[in-house]
A protein has these predicted regions:
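Core segments of small alpha/beta cavity-forming domains
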Residues: 1-46
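Exposed beta-sheet edge and beta->alpha loop/turn motif
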Residues: 50-116
Length: 116
C-alpha cells in the first residue's frame, strides 16, 4: 500500500508501485523490509530550467537492510535474503505540482547516472 507515502511520491511512481504490488498480490507475494538504515545520501546531479517540468535532482543513496519476499499463504521466503545487505540506489526527484517528489529508484549497477 503506497498511501502512507503518496504525498512524497510522483503520480507516475505511485502508479508503477501500485501495479507491482498488484502483481505481487496475484502471485500471493508480499515484500518484507526490516532494519532499514540510511548510511549516506549524496546529491550527484541537479537540473534546473525555466519552469518546473524538467527540474530534477538525483541522489546516490547508500543504505543497509534486510529485504525479501514471502508467500502470503505459507510465510515461506520466495526470494531475497533474510540477512542484512548493503545497497546503493539512485533516487530521482522531480518537481510536480509545485513540490519535490520521488519519481524513480534505480539500482546503482543498473544505470549510468549520466543517462538519468
Amino acid at each position: 500500500d503506497t498511501s502512507y507515502a503518496e504525498k512524497y511520491l510522483s503520480k507516475n511512481l505511485i502508479q508503477n508501485w501500485n501495479s507491482k504490488l498488484g502483481w505481487m498480490e496475484v502471485n500471493r507475494e508480499k515484500p518484507v523490509q526490516e532494519r532499514v538504515r540510511l548510511l549516506n545520501a549524496a546529491p550527484v546531479f541537479a537540473f534546473d530550467k525555466e519552469g518546473e517540468e524538467h527540474d530534477r535532482v538525483i541522489y546516490l543513496i547508500h543504505g543497509r537492510m534486510i529485504g525479501y519476499y514471502i508467500n502470503i499463504d505459507t510465510g515461506e521466503v520466495v526470494r531475497g535474503k533474510t540477512s542484512p545487505e548493503t545497497f546503493y540506489e539512485y533516487w530521482v526527484y522531480i518537481r510536480e505540482d509545485g513540490r519535490w517528489v520521488l519519481d524513480e529508484i534505480r539500482q546503482k549497477d543498473e544505470v549510468d547516472v549520466e543517462q538519468l
